[in-house]
């Protein structure tokens, strides 16, 4: 697991998204995607000008980590479904791969959610282990072939109007960098967010 490996210093850095650490730190879900929450512009305004960055760094420092926001994904699709969805009733009993706080919403309406890694989604659809999935933006989902099995796609994603991805750096390694090196990492990631 990236979180523990970077935190312990087994590796210097890793790439992920904060929502995967919700079991360890529930508050970090607000640094990845919030159902019915802010779009990318609003999230970035809070992150840069509303204290979000400092709060994120404070939370992670307790775990010997330094986060750097490196990617912002615009709205994802609400999912790819084998069967057409016409009402909330159609979600009851649906087996679906779902991420983060959105999974809690889907569970409340009667779906049965599970979190699968990206590479496990297509085989799970193919085998019928899941009936539907959400994962990323439609362009990424299409590259992964979800449409070949789950023909019905709904957009935009209410559960992830914007998604932040992070570069996790071991805090001891981060602190050992020069101010110039830190600025280079921050600038590179900022450029990635802006130009995606």
Predicted regions and their residues:
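N-terminal secretory/targeting leader peptides
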Residues: 1-43, 51-196
């Amino acid at each position: 697991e990236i979180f523990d490996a970077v935190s312990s210093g087994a590796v210097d850095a890793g790439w992920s998204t904060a929502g995967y650490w919700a079991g360890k730190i529930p508050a970090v879900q607000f640094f990845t995607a919030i159902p019915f929450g802010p779009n990318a512009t609003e999230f970035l305004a809070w992150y840069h000008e509303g204290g979000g960055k400092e709060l994120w760094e404070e939370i992670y420092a307790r775990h010997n980590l330094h986060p750097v926001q490196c990617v912002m994904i615009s709205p994802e699709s609400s999912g790819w479904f084998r069967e057409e969805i016409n009402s909330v009733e159609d979600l009851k009993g649906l087996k679906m791969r779902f991420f983060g706080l959105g999974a809690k919403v889907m569970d409340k309406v009667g779906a049965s959610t599970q979190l699968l890694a990206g590479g496990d989604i297509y085989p799970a659809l193919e085998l019928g282990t899941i009936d539907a999935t959400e994962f990323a933006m439609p362009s990424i989902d299409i590259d992964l072939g979800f449409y070949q099995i789950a023909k019905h796609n709904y957009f935009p994603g209410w559960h992830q109007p914007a998604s932040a991805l992070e570069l996790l750096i071991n805090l001891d390694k981060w602190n050992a960098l020069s101010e110039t090196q830190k600025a280079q990492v921050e600038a590179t990631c900022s450029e990635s967010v802006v130009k995606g």
